[in-house]
Structures are given as C-alpha cells and as structure tokens.
Swiss-Prot record:
NCBIfam families in UniProt: PRK02853.1 (NF002769)
Protein name stated in the entry: UPF0262 protein GbCGDNIH1_1393
Source organism phylogeny: Bacteria, Pseudomonadati, Pseudomonadota, Alphaproteobacteria, Acetobacterales
Domain of life of the source: Bacteria
Parts of the chain that traverse the membrane: none
Organism per entry: Granulibacter bethesdensis (strain ATCC BAA-1260 / CGDNIH1)
Length: 176
C-alpha cells in the first residue's frame, strides 16, 4: 500500500462510527440497578468502539455529506425502535424505524434473565449465576444477529455494535 492509502484508512474508519449514543424515553427512569449497569456499560462500550454507517445515499445528498461520525438518538415510540441518526454537530440526517415484533421474545427473555440473575445473587448461588451469565451471552448473541439482519441494507454494523444496540433495546423496552 502507498503512504497515501495508509493515511486515508484512519479517516475512513473514524467516519464509520457512532460518536455519541443518546437514549430517550420514560423507561429510563424505571431501570433496575442491573439494567442501569447494562445500559451504562453498553453506551460506554458503543461510544468507545463501534462500526456504524449508512449503507446507501439518502435522496439529495452525496455520500461524503452522509459520512460520520454519527450521533444516534435511540428510542422506542409506538411499538417501533427509532434510530434518529444525526451528524457530528447533532443536525438531523435521517430516521429509521424498525418494528419491535421480531425482538419481542428476546426482550421478554432478557427481562426474565435479569430477574433470575437478581434472585440468584440474593441467594448467593454461584453456579446459578454462572449459568444465567451464559444464557445472557447466548441471548445477546441471538439479539445481535437479529439486529444485523433487521438493519441489513440500511445501516452497516459489526457484531459487537449489534450486541450493544440489542442491550439498549432491551433496556429501553418495558416488560412485555
């Protein structure tokens, strides 16, 4: 590779990412300590490292004007997951709405696992805690695959970004 190509790669990588994630919604005021911990960790991890970019140009815009880094306002409104995507200066870029239906079973399972985890911690059952952690990892992996599938053709994300976004969807959504 030439030096010129090497110089552009960090710029391209920096433009295909989320700079900031903002969660919106009343559900955030009623989080359990474990859900709050999941939320804080997912947001911190997302802001530190992620892959996120629009896959196709928006009408009337050039691909260069749509490059990130992006600010993501994530919320749930009227049964839909809302990706309000903005430029680095927080000016509006686009909104993507996904139906929550395909996520419902996984969200319900997430809340059941959170309840089971809290109970296992209270009872100091180490083997149970480890089993629940394994289940949570599997659930998050399944949620990540579904997230990537649902965003396919719209937003390009890697597996770890999808996993963290799935965590935030679960935190935003009240019990089903």
């Amino acid at each position: 590779m030439s030096a010129k190509q090497d110089d552009t790669q960090p710029i391209q990588a920096a433009s295909k990412r989320l700079l900031k994630v903002i969660l919106e919604g009343e559900a955030l005021t009623r989080l359990s300590p474990l859900q709050e911990m999941d939320r804080a960790q997912a947001v911190a991890d997302l802001e530190a490292e992620n892959v996120f970019s629009l896959e196709r140009p928006l009408p009337g815009m050039t691909p260069v004007s749509e490059q990130g880094p992006y600010v993501l306002h994530l919320s749930i409104q009227e049964g839909r997951l809302i990706f309000d995507i903005r430029r680095q200066d927080d000016t509006f870029l686009t909104v993507l709405a996904l139906a929550l239906g395909p996520f419902r079973r996984l969200i319900k399972d997430y809340h059941l696992l959170v309840d089971s985890y809290v109970k296992a911690v209270q009872e100091a059952r180490e083997a149970r805690i480890q089993a629940i952690d394994m289940g949570r990892r599997g659930l998050h992996n399944e949620g990540a695959e579904l997230m990537r599938h649902r965003l396919n053709g719209k937003i390009s994300i890697d597996f770890e970004t999808a996993r963290r976004l799935f965590t935030l969807v679960c935190v935003l959504h009240q019990r089903i």
